[in-house]
Amino acid sequence: MRVVVLGSGVVGVASAYYLARAGHEVTVIDREAGPALETSFANAGQISPGYAAPWAAPGVPLKAVKWMFEKHAPLAIRLDGTRFQLQWMWQMLRNCTADRYAVNKGRMVRLAEYSRDCLQALRADTGIQYEGRTGGTLQLFRTQQQLDGAAKDIAVLQEANVPFELLSPAELKNAEPALAAVSHKLTGGLRLPGDETGDCQLFTTRLAALAESLGVKFRYNTPIDSLAIAGGRIAGVQCGSETVRADAYVVALGSYSTSFISNLMKIPVYPLKGYSITAPIVNDAAAPVSTVLDETYKIAITRFDQRIRVGGMAEIVGFDKNLRAARRETLEMCVNDLFPGGGDTSKATFWTGLRPMTPDGTPIVGRTPVSNLFLNTGHGTLGWTMSCGSGQLLADLISGKKPAIQADDLSVHRYLKDVAGQTRPAYA
């Protein structure tokens, strides 16, 4: 089968790779000059299935109000003048209940755990290298309230059989030796030893090369204008004056997926702006060995070979990609507070990206009401974590195979109108 994949971020490239492995003739189209040059370029670098969780959580609405007045707040909201933004925020608020959080986190962990398994199999099969580490993830708590609040996450981890360790301040140094110097600032930590880290952009570039070796064609610097419709099916992709035709089409355009298919269906994928800095390591003993999550600031600090990546925060501000100096200040403050002297933040590069987020946190992967159109988008802050599993899942669906995990609750159908014409709730 001929398949066109739109988008060459980590999700699009993973989709292409697994489709090619399944025997399909695949073409990837992207407006950029190469793979992973937008949202996948400088993300936090963590592959954290156990920490796969929706931003829509109990207590978040009240926290959001408090964060409005804090200098280093992890969340910021600025109205962009669109009705879509208001609708999306309302849908997100409706998911901020304990019941919805448990459902959403459960299916996110399911896909993320499967994706980690797919990544491990890929690594064993191909030997792909991307400055990856398998040292786990450590979530740090600065208050007793944060530590107590981890109970709901631990319950989900236990239900999903995800191994974890609850550490006291004195035990944190066993996972991250450099934290011994700052343990007095912390009340404890939750460690997931099965989590991994790695450079997403490097991984995507090398996976694209592997995909090319399987026959995948990459068409970069190519405009993606619209989908041509005929007889209720996709008849082609309009790329400037050219129409590219295939048997099936995959939209993996991140935050831009929403507007691209708006004439066919309405999907609630909104750009959640995040930031990162990447600093050279100057003192190995003072640097992290894997990934640390600061629960207070919602910031991830990740170790690559000779670099530290610090990323996080969320701004609901539309498609604004301006770099705000205050956000860099927050990232530098966080890493220097936990790992003083580990990296030289004065020499750090500064980046921002738009994560494609759904109101319930769960991505949209699978079939659509248009028989030959498939979606692989809406992964939010977990595109790197979920990429391989989403790609394999999509390849199975297109190939007519039964997926290895439950997939019906990941599709776009949870957002579309039912047979009675009623819109299904965004928390379905």
From Swiss-Prot:
Pfam families named among the record's database cross-references: DAO (PF01266)
This protein's GO CC annotations: cytoplasm; plasma membrane
Keyword vocabulary terms for this entry: FAD, Flavoprotein, Oxidoreductase
The UniProt record lists the keyword Flavoprotein: yes
Enzyme nomenclature, EC number: 1.4.99.-
Entry-linked SUPFAM superfamilies: FAD-linked reductases, C-terminal domain, FAD/NAD(P)-binding domain
One biological process term in Gene Ontology: D-alanine catabolic process
Pathway: Amino-acid degradation; D-alanine degradation; NH(3) and pyruvate from D-alanine: step 1/1
Keyword match rRNA-binding: no
Cysteines paired by S-S bonds: none
Gene3D superfamilies per the UniProt record, alphabetical: D-Amino Acid Oxidase, subunit A, domain 2 (3.30.9.10), FAD/NAD(P)-binding domain (3.50.50.60)
Superkingdom per UniProt: Bacteria
A GO term for molecular function: D-amino-acid dehydrogenase activity
Binding site residues for FAD: 3-17
Cofactor: FAD
InterPro entries the record matches: DadA (IPR023080), FAD-dep_OxRdtase (IPR006076), FAD/NAD-bd_sf (IPR036188)
Catalytic activity: a D-alpha-amino acid + A + H2O = a 2-oxocarboxylate + AH2 + NH4(+)
Top-rank EC class of the record's enzyme: oxidoreductase
UniProt record similarity statement: Belongs to the DadA oxidoreductase family.
Function: Oxidative deamination of D-amino acids.
Protein name (Swiss-Prot/TrEMBL): D-amino acid dehydrogenase
Designated gene of the protein: dadA
